[in-house]
Amino acid sequence: MSKETNRRGNCTSGWSIPFSGSKKWVIFDPDMNATYWYCAVTRDPEDTTGFKFHGKFGHARYQAYNVYNDDTKDLIWGDDATHISALSDVNTVPDEGSNNPYQLAVPRDTREREYTVWVVPDGSDTSGYSNFITIPEDVEKLSIFLRVYLPTRTSKAGCVAKTELMYTNS
């Protein structure tokens, strides 16, 4: 975070309003059948601030977290295969006591469907995290997107708007 916005705690209000990928101003290859939320971040290279996303798997066909480098307009790690820049639904490990409805043999309407995703500076201790994406030290401007594809008609954008965003000190 830049010095003027460096804080800790709940920052759920930092999420954008949900928007459709059909909007012409949406960058990063939007899909018109998806609903998006994003959080734009400007940070100093030595910053140790990370982000914790806690929510429920959406009632939708697909969901994923993608982290982009705003300067290059590419995924945060580009073509570096040793790091991940995105976390898809099927690869997201559910919180203890919960189930991932995107995995085989799990009912889509499972009630316990919570997960936690961390986005933290590269070099942070991630040994206690099941789901994480690291931020390269040299990336100062990034956007974290949550994409929900084809939410069910009975759910409001897949019910992921309640995903809580927290600043953490990695």
Language-model-derived ranges and their functions:
Residues 1-170:
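A compositional/structural signature for long, glycine/proline-rich flexible linkers
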